[in-house]
């Protein structure tokens, strides 16, 4: 949960998640939809899917006991170099590094690394150096101390160099370039897309929702169906096409309900939400994992992305 998310945000989610899934076996036995629902609001849902898959793999391949080595941990879904290194060193005292953003920043300043350190040769060099620094005695404490140094003193802005215990050997400080390090990759402009969504209400008051395919972005989450507009395509035409392709239905596009702007890691969207009339026919999961006709109070039982949660809130408020 702490990957990409601050501690203050994570704590209530963490406590609630453990109430739902108090043990690894409970998590492994749970339905993915229930895991995503418990994760709802944290974002980066691939983390939840990987956590669920890793729990299942630990149960089936390791007898329900977490592997005790870096190599075995690295084979679990969602366990990259950092996570595997942190668990192996802190929980099992294996002499391996745990290189997160804080550690990269400390080492880049300490060694005056003037190349971008997120990827490539410089990143591999820092990982190798970190591996050489980890002591055989209490490797987990060393890794945590290095991370804490980056979080508390060697901060991204205004590093507190006068208080730093390694200031005497810091090459970045000696050269007066510590504030310029680590070198960051040029920030790319995020593309923008217009996306449509249909609030389709049947005569009995039920709403049509669709579940995204597991391999899709936000896979496993539910949504008000729709999709991305093609160049020079009007919003109503886009919505009619998407609903036909996704569910095999014909709809009448009504008035605009709302427009929601939202940013993801690599792109931004304007979500245009329309009230739509159901013209008949039985939905089919043509380009989605599943579909449901759901009463308004029951929408709370499904896991939705943040944009769809805002639509649900509007419906609950009577819009």
Label for each model-derived stretch:
Residues 199-201, 273-277:
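Short, well-ordered beta-strand micro-motif
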Residues 187-191, 215, 260-271:
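Acidic pyrophosphate-coordinating catalytic loop
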Residues 275-318:
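NUDIX/MutT-family hydrolases
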Residues 178-223, 252-255:
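N-terminal strand-loop-strand
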Residues 167-196, 263, 299-317:
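Acidic, metal-coordinating catalytic segment for phosphate/diphosphate chemistry
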Residues 2-175, 250:
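Catalytic cores of DNA base-excision repair glycosylases
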